[in-house]
Amino acid sequence: MKVKAGIFNPLVPDKVVEVEGIVDTGAVYTVIRRDVLEGLGIRPVKRGRFKALGSYVERDVGEAGLVLMGERRVVPVIFGEAEDVLVIGLTALEIFGLEVDPVRGTLKEAELLLL
């Protein structure tokens, strides 16, 4: 499912870059191209090893501000390569309290559980 989102540096929240990507509930993390993140002054905080398409890749990891449906949150992100598509993963959806409505093909507020 395609979605429009805003990306911002939590330390400079007024500068927002509008992007288009896909929501993938099978992806744990959000992937944003490195050039977009670095253009906002977002730096990696660590490097991680991830399984992707049957093999392993190493990518930098950081935190970025994300705007979805008018709400702003800070989410963990993977620094994507030039060929990577922007992906909004399940962790970001949970932080926002959102889920996919498969009938309408949109995002909607999720029923939140307190466990």
Pin down the residues of each PLM region.
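Pepsin/retropepsin-fold aspartyl endopeptidases
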Residues: 1-115
